[in-house]
Amino acid sequence: MSYTKDNDKLYRYLFQNRAVRGEWVRLNDTFTETLNTHQYPKAVQNLLGEMLVATSLLTAIMKFEGTITVQIQGDGPLKLAVVNGNEKQQLRALARTQAEIADNASLSEMIGNGVLVISIMPNDGERYQGVIALDKPTIRECLEDYFIRSEQLQTHLVIRTGEYEGKAVAGGLLLQIMPDGTGMPEDFEHLMTLAETVKDEELFGLEAEELLFRLYHEEQVEVYPPQETEFYCGCSRERSGNAILLLPMEEIDEMLAEKNGVIDMQCECCGTQYFFDKNAIMEFKQEADKLNQLGL
């Protein structure tokens, strides 16, 4: 098998006679570009892959315009892991470690005592934040518990990370009983059992329609057009310049003196470097002063 047209794609589908909806996503370049600028331990790479898949699936199932942040905070060797996504399936991820992490470390060994925080920020409407105890062995199980508690909807996730043809890849399936109350638990359990039979090479290597046929060839499945996923940082020179202006000018001048007249800032997410001399900083300050005068 070889890479297919469905790399970096998310598909939604509906089981017509079961009142269950589903999603499938595979992250190829979306995942590898997240890892390119960091030397994360293998276990952290896998965790970020799982979180990217989960965020992609969550963003698609909630059907709103805005952003979702899935964040892990703990007191273990992995201090922080965070993924941001939006309705355009633009994703980014970041992790911070504070001690060595073995390649085969479990979630609890990495996190220690920690929580999973899901922040939903619609462009229009109220923000929502859910906090979930990381008291289960995997992210998948914690998220399934989240859906039961917050949405009262049976939800099943399959999330895998690994390598395919020498490249990092992450993929997943989501099944959810329809929120209109017409779904039957036994139908959901049947489809969930079938989903668990998926092999890594199928999830990572098949096109969506072939994968769904292999899993659900006796079902009537309506597949909707795909949505592309991509790594998207969103950093910019303007944002970095404005971040410098959060400091007092006296402190900025001291930094310029210490750094031979040039302040450099590197994006923690994508690794892009931005350089600012005194003239550039003053240009940003003048623009900020104008906006303040206009009340913007």
Swiss-Prot record:
Domain of life: Bacteria
InterPro entries hit by this protein: Heat_shock_Hsp33, Heat_shock_Hsp33_C, Heat_shock_Hsp33_N, Hsp33_helix_hairpin_bin_dom_sf
Disulphide-bonded residues: 233-235, 267-270
Single annotated GO MF: protein folding chaperone
Keyword Glycosyltransferase found: no
GO terms classed as biological process: protein refolding
Compartment(s) of residence: Cytoplasm
Keywords: Chaperone, Cytoplasm, Disulfide bond, Redox-active center, Stress response, Zinc
Post-translational events: Under oxidizing conditions two disulfide bonds are formed involving the reactive cysteines. Under reducing conditions zinc is bound to the reactive cysteines and the protein is inactive.
Family annotation (CDD domains): Hsp33
Listed GO CC annotations: cytoplasm
Purpose: Redox regulated molecular chaperone. Protects both thermally unfolding and oxidatively damaged proteins from irreversible aggregation. Plays an important role in the bacterial defense system toward oxidative stress.
Family label: Belongs to the HSP33 family.
HAMAP family the UniProt entry points to: HslO
PANTHER family: 33 KDA CHAPERONIN
Full protein name: 33 kDa chaperonin
Organism encoding this protein: Actinobacillus pleuropneumoniae serotype 7 (strain AP76)
Gene name linked to the record: hslO
